[in-house]
């Protein structure tokens, strides 16, 4: 056997190694227990992958993002094997890793019960303990069809691969290039225990799955279409250690306490009446108060930053979205057309941008007007499948704080930098502080425009992002059909990441709508367009803030900022006068004049997460004072009314948390 040279890459450090021909990645990293797979030539591979001369090999450790995804994918196989051991008639769907976990879909005779899930977890634990070996086999299409003849969904995926090539569902299982099956083999006898169509890679053995849990089950349509059979989906999670699993479960429990859907009901903020339909929220008075404050503050900041407010209708003729390309690229996300005016198709608008373009085009424009920044709280409608809608974070009727900026080419770098700074500053005003940026590039096969235009737009966004002193993460292929985008990712109080603002450079729509302005030299030039949604949507940002603060919004955002609590009914008029003073200064205040005892009134206000409580009894009335009680239970007695009012106003004006 001859020797070959390979390079081991660890971050910025590279080490050249001489190894025997046929050496595997496992042998290269022998003794490094945390290494569960490798990246060879930029592609993820099993540790059993043989190395060739010139290969650049990077270890993938179990505690890295890629490592966790591989562990979770392998655990999905183990859970699927457990299901088929317990329910032999179960047919397999797909089982990909997802954020913080994995799922696997099954066609079974009945939904899984909690007892079933316990049994599945127990059997999966036995499989992991057995140390079954993951072994990759390359097969032909005919061989795959023969081996998986009893798995109709796998057969369908094989067909999708051969006919479509890049089908998303097929890609989860079969990927690109050759077809592969992974066998789970008995570590002693080598006997086949189970197999699945899969592109891999996987951990070497089931013992390389350090910690996992089966979480829940739910119904899911095959390939996400309501026209297809309904399957049963088992969700699970897997981590690099038991401690990491416990920490995740703690975060999950904390997230459940903060669930905006539960808080929305408890705090009487919003609801989703079945009479209206899934994904369509109704905001109650208290929720409406929060939205009003959010929008009013945003409106004020936008005016200060040179934005001009516009309003556009909720429906439009199809012509508009034919020109924009939405009907070609976004039709699945739109509601069906309404036929009006003698057969013309009208659509509920899914996006505001084409209408803002029409405002720009409504008259001749000069370079002196640029940059032109148009802004709207525009409600749009998107047909999200009923199984996908989720509280306020995924809805069908949504209000975007939507801006479209039109500028000259030479203004783009400055405008992008200004927009990003404005976005981050405004998000910080709402109490979010921990950010990173994500740059999404051209989506393969789903984009309009030339390579040069995309490269130029992407580079402009990259330059703007680099000036913000924040981490920049690449999202290859994640851009919109008309241009690349930067998204602001924010981490909340319990460390979860939320995508918030998006900023997109668009070369395409100005061309499609033949937009022009008169340049300084008298020629007609094409403006450049920036799409920008700061909150993303009002509804989603509302939910994020509610969960970030666990319902205890800072005083300036709280729907009720102050509650007056009289010790007896005799003190109601006094507190009513105090409330009037606060109300005159714009404070949202209530007086609890119910028949409840004082202690219950305090508990009620605390449950409603009211920032300030003003208590009054005989002594307070005599002194013109109140007892000033805070949300955390601390209390100052004998505070003069004017001092209490001033302190409340100060907290609201400075937007501080209490």
UniProtKB/Swiss-Prot annotation:
Q: Where is this region: Catalytic?
A: 259-554
Which reaction is the catalytic activity of this chain?
A: tRNA(Thr) + L-threonine + ATP = L-threonyl-tRNA(Thr) + AMP + diphosphate + H(+)
Binding annotation for Zn(2+): 353, 404, 531
Q: What is its main location?
A: cytoplasm
Free-text comment on the cofactor: Binds 1 zinc ion per subunit.
Q: Which NCBIfam families match?
A: thrS
Q: Into which family does the record put it?
A: Belongs to the class-II aminoacyl-tRNA synthetase family.
Q: What is this protein called?
A: Threonine--tRNA ligase
User: Which source organism?
Assistant: Parafrankia sp. (strain EAN1pec)
User: Gene encoding it?
Assistant: thrS
